[in-house]
Amino acid sequence: MAALLLRHVGRHCLRAHLSPQLCIRNAVPLGTTAKEEMERFWSKNTTLNRPLSPHISIYGWSLPMAMSICHRGTGIALSAGVSLFGLSALLVPGSFESHLEFVKSLCLGPALIHTAKFALVFPLMYHTWNGIRHLMWDLGKGLTISQLHQSGVAVLVLTVLSSVGLAAM
């Protein structure tokens, strides 16, 4: 707003063929620069031994907080995984069948295959169940602290059970 007013006054002065100094007679130079102010701020915080604000150490970790962070992380990981899989399908030579035959020729044990399938399906199931939980919140259901913890535990149990079930297929 101030910049627009200053621009308007400046244009008015130019139109009137006056110098800007005549139009802005009460201009006061700044006492300090932003750099000096930042240096003073950081030196004060250093001498008082203050942590960065807001610092992660001031927060008490809770189940809903950790699950929110994990929900965002799984969303990013799943998006990146799908994008990379699509790009690799376009850029890597050969067909899907040839890559599948290559994996079969490695003779991996069933335990390793089951573990890999579980590791792939776990983030998907967690993001799905926690997404349903978020949709319930959008409906106004389960917003008390005790219900947040109960639904969090339910999401974790459902995630493990559905991941084990899908990995066993």
Curated annotation (Swiss-Prot):
Pathway: Carbohydrate metabolism; tricarboxylic acid cycle. The keyword rRNA-binding does not apply. GO terms for cellular component: mitochondrial inner membrane; respiratory chain complex II (succinate dehydrogenase). The N-terminus is blocked. Component of complex II composed of four subunits: the flavoprotein (FP) SDHA, iron-sulfur protein (IP) SDHB, and a cytochrome b560 composed of SDHC and SDHD. PANTHER family: SUCCINATE DEHYDROGENASE CYTOCHROME B560 SUBUNIT, SUCCINATE DEHYDROGENASE CYTOCHROME B560 SUBUNIT, MITOCHONDRIAL. Belongs to the cytochrome b560 family. This is Succinate dehydrogenase cytochrome b560 subunit, mitochondrial.
